[in-house]
Amino acid sequence: DYWKSVELTMMHKAAVSYYPSYVEINAIHAIDGSIHAKAITAYVYDTFLSNIQDDFAKREGLLFVGGFAHPPNADAVLWFAREIFPAIRKRIPGIRFYVVGSKVTGEIQALGQEEGIVIKGFVSEEELKELYSACKLVVVPLRYGAGVKGKVVEAIYHGAPIVTTSTGAEGIPFV
């Protein structure tokens, strides 16, 4: 409670407090609606991609991108691979689930022995661009976590359709 009161005192003294999304602003306003707060988007790109493949009939597979040192990412892939992907494979035989990210754990690596799951691990920027343009969907099956998800913003930037949870979409009003 001490640090909470210090933080609130500082916010009252400040002309404005900045947060990464409206989610944090709503949380602050639930505590004290008089605090002046604004959101600064964490997703600004200085260029726009022009080579996005619009012919989705030529695309195949599902893509997940995220570092596995972050527990919500490991949980998301394990849950999706074990609980969701088998049902998808029943309806779409031959579909592949590509898993990209650094610090792949043994448990994640073992998923690669399952039919249709391809553990890519860390890839170059060029290979990542190719995967974004080749896959039909990016999946962001996060079950917990907070704030704006860079993986969602990156998928949008690459023109990839996204299927996510409310946690994955948090902080991005147009998702």
PLM segments and residue spans:
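Short acidic/histidine- and often glycine-rich active-site loop of Leloir-type glycosyltransferases
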Residues: S166-V175
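Acceptor-binding helix/loop patch of EC 2.4 sugar-transfer enzymes
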Residues: D1-S5, A57, G67, T167
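Short hydrophobic beta-strand element within catalytic cores of glycosyltransferases
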Residues: K151-E154, P161-T165
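Acidic donor-binding loop of glycosyltransferase active sites
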Residues: A15, S133-G147, H158-P161
